[in-house]
């Protein structure tokens, strides 16, 4: 019972690729918050695990171009079939931001690699469970490379398994973790609706 109360269903099957579709509202809330904080994004946004294209579709509403990487074609027209962890800096233009919902089990690898690819001052936003704050290995990473902002949602965000329709609410809390490469101050909390 305690597992269920903590938002974990021990009977639930995880998607083998950790493919959970981001609710569009989550991306819109992020874009609005970045605007409110005067965090300007460059013209190009990269999604490291594009899936069905929810993140690029949303950022395009704000006038940005987008490219997306994935290990499988899940229907977004601009998908580049390549594991993001193998992308090299010369594969990308000089000025871009990263907005992603990576596989949870590989999230730290995706964040580290993304930060390595970004120029100083570059922005990386990663959609994660709030429990991403926990764990000794992530604590060490956060101590050395703190996010500029942690943006938790006050209303639960629903993530669809494999793009399926979400029928019920979620017991899992999510947040955007936002890095500005080179910034080392303590993170600020920005509440999202």
Residue map of PLM features:
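Class I S-adenosyl-L-methionine-dependent methyltransferase catalytic core
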Residues: 1-193
